[in-house]
Amino acid sequence: HVRHIVGDDLFMKYSLTPARPGLTAAKIQWVKENQPQIYEKVEHILLPKDYLRYRLTGEYATEVSDASATQILDIPNRKWSDEIMTAMNLNEAMLGKVYESQEITGYVLPEVAKLMGITSKCAVVGGASDNSAGGVGTGVVAPGRAMTTIGTSGTVFAFSEEPVLDINKSVYTFCMPVPGAWHFMGSVNSCGASLKWWRNNFYPDDLEYEQINKDA
C-alpha cells in the first residue's frame, strides 16, 4: 500500500529504490492500516540502535547510514525527504534529527552514567548500520573497494563517490558512514541458511566451509 500512497517515482527520486516491503516505510504504513489503535499512540519512530541512543542520552536522533534503509531519507542530500514525509503524514519530530555517523548526537544522561559507572561527559556519536560499519571496518572507504559478508544474510557491499541510481532496481544505494560518500549493496536474506542446507545435504558433516569455498 505504501507504493500507492507515496509512489515509486518519489521513492526512486529520494530513496533510490522502489517501494520495498522489508524497509521501514512499508512497515509504518502496515501498522497505520492494520493496527490503527496502536499507531494513533505513536509519538516517535526509532530504529533499534537509535532507541538505545534515546535511553542513553534522551535524544531522538538517527544517522544517515541506518536512515537510508527507512525509505524516508533523501539519500542524495542526506536528510529526511519532505515529499515522502508529507505523503505518509510524518514529520521530522517523529523521526528524529539526522546526523552524519561521526557526529556527536548527545551525552550520556547523569542517571544513566551513574548506573553504568561511567562519566556523564561520555559522548554518543551517530554510529552506523551493521553492513556499513563492517564496510568501514574492512576498509571499503575508497573507490574500487568492495566486500562480501555471509551470515544470516549474504551481502555484497561496494563504495561509491556518488549517489548513483541502479536503473535495474537490483541493488540499494545508501549513505556511507563517511561524509560525502555512498555505497551499493545487494543482499540475499536467506544466504546463511542456504549455505548450511547445501553443506548438510551435499558434503560430509565434518567438512569445513573452506573446502566448499574452494569447490565453488
Feature map (PLM): residue ranges:
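Active-site core segments that coordinate phosphate-bearing ligands/cofactors
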Residues: 3-61, 66, 71-82, 86-89, ...
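A conserved helix-loop-beta module that forms one wall/lid of the active-site cleft
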Residues: 89-100
